[in-house]
Amino acid sequence: MLVALVVLFLSVFMAMKFLYKRIFVASRLKMIEKPSEDWEPASREAMIERLRSEVFDLVVVGGGSTGAGCALDGATRGLKVALVDAGDFGSGTSSKSTKLVHGGVRYLAKAVSNLDWSQYKLVWQALGERTTMFEISPYLTNSIKIMVPIYSKILIPYYYVGLKLYDWISGFKSLGKSYFIDRKEAVDAFPHINKKNLCGAMVYFDGQQDDARNNVMIVMTAVCHGAVAANHVSARSLMIEGGKIVGVRCRDEITGSEIEIRGTGVINSTGNLADDLRRMDDADAREIIVQSSGTHIVIPKEYAPKEMGFLDPLTSDNRIAFFMPWMGKTIVGSTDIKTKTELSPSPTEEDLEFLIHEVQAYTSMHPKLTRDEVSAVWTGIRPLVKDPDVSDTGSIVRKHFVRIEKNGLLTVTGGKWTIYRKMAEDAIDLAISAFSLKPSGPCVTKYVRILGGDGYTKNTWASIQKELGVPKNVAERLARSYGTRALRLSSYIKKNRKKVLSVKYSYLIEEVEYCIDNEMAVKVCDVLCNRLMIGLMDVKEAYQCIDKVLGVFKKKHGWDADRCNREEADAIRMLDKYGLQILRGCGQDASSLQMECPEEKRHRGERRLPPQEK
């Protein structure tokens, strides 16, 4: 009887707490203004001036997924938030993922095999956040089937039970129930699968996203709700007065000017560089980041099953690799190699050859995949977290880590893309407590859609096609990229009459101008790699687009020849991070690799690849 009363009391208490929170959140949401359809951010110059002259509740350093999430969470709680990033928003690890929104089947396998409750909690939490991301980023996420090949009948029960457990943990958040297909069905779905000893396959459901654009749109949504943000602004030192952090000294990487940004609290969301900023707070701080590089290659769509992904359950280095359809291509990755601190790493020959070998091992295409078919290769660094108070590395997991450092720096790191919103919520909760901030309400980011998400449906492309007068395939891509905000392209198209940026991928010149005005793109590489994604898909095509993108910037901002030359050089250096250096020459005659003067290449309307470095 006593136990029953205790259970009843706890149930009523939890129900009342839940109801109170929902009512509180609902009242706060009513206070938050819906963004107007014609909203666009202030100019970069205006943002920089505000960073110089105002005092903020929070200064967030690092504009990847977690930092962007912190800016949005803080702004929607009524806090005054500043956000800076040394490069472009999300241009580091956050744009170089496998594009999955997932619980993590490998973490579930570890949870079962090692009886590890922390891994189980990680999966359960991530599956909940997957559902939330589908709600708040509707046009940048989608569900996808993933095939897991089985080459031994003994393993069929293992994969069947494991993926059914994944379904069960998903519960009402499930995107679909996993199922078994026999050998014939597996071959029908993926004609080029390695058929030797193939017994069949399991198919399960998970999520996929456009990570780079999602990151950018989270930042834009934060700015729309009052945050002040600037990309290409690097943190150089912390401002410490009386043993307390009062701001960040930064450098504007565009103009070279110094900026002091003052704030009650500073959040370190710099990912794999978190230890660098922690040592600015405390020179003796023990490292918490173990860096692991992950490389992906982009190859033709034929190397993945029809309308589904493919999971290589055991690579030659005892990991798993995904073959995921994405924007008419296939992404394959990733590697897992311990690495050093680096803001934007370049892919290596070893990574490229390893991934080509993995594709060759799991496909039966003849001839086998060659370097000529690789259109891009890029590397990101996972910020794996270890406990600074534990000397061994056994504590390294994918959970996130939030703590206050010696002089008050708040560090949030670890985790993964799928749980960025929860990481940000935990960081802002701690910031409010640690810095005695006064928010106007609780966290509401579970219910705040990114710009372009309100009113979006699967048929939004039809409205875009009607309004812009573009072919169906272009309208569908615009809907998937911009959501309902694609309709804002109308005024740009009327002005420019639908000029083509890339015939190969149906990108429009108008999109470049739109991204400059509406998405804070300030450099050529911002457009090519983090807004239009051409660099991520096809690095040589991105190289060919440099002049056209440069032309739009020159016309809008009046760039002189010196600035244009610097931007061109910066863009080429950035494209090297997407494989331009190690892929150049593939499938081309060596004579075509000679440099041309700008006048000659513009006269020809085509750029020749620069010579390969020795």
Swiss-Prot record:
InterPro entries in alphabetical order: DAO_C, DAO_C_sf, FAD-dep_OxRdtase, FAD/NAD-bd_sf, G3P_DH_FAD-dep
Localization per record: Cytoplasm
Entry binding sites for FAD: 57-85
Enzyme Commission identifier(s): 1.1.5.3
Catalytic activity entry: a quinone + sn-glycerol 3-phosphate = dihydroxyacetone phosphate + a quinol
Major enzyme class: oxidoreductase
Family annotation (Pfam families): DAO, DAO_C
UniProt GO MF annotations: glycerol-3-phosphate dehydrogenase (quinone) activity
Cofactor (UniProt): FAD
GO biological process: one example: glycerol catabolic process
Ranges for region Disordered: 595-614
GO cellular component term of the entry, any: mitochondrion
Pathway(s) per entry: Polyol metabolism; glycerol degradation via glycerol kinase pathway; glycerone phosphate from sn-glycerol 3-phosphate (anaerobic route): step 1/1
Keywords: Cytoplasm, FAD, Flavoprotein, Oxidoreductase
Compositionally biased tracts (Basic and acidic residues): 598-614
Family, similarity comment: Belongs to the FAD-dependent glycerol-3-phosphate dehydrogenase family.
Name this protein carries in UniProt: Probable glycerol-3-phosphate dehydrogenase
Organism of this sequence: Encephalitozoon cuniculi (strain GB-M1) (Microsporidian parasite)
Top-level taxonomy: Eukaryota, Fungi, Fungi incertae sedis, Microsporidia, Unikaryonidae
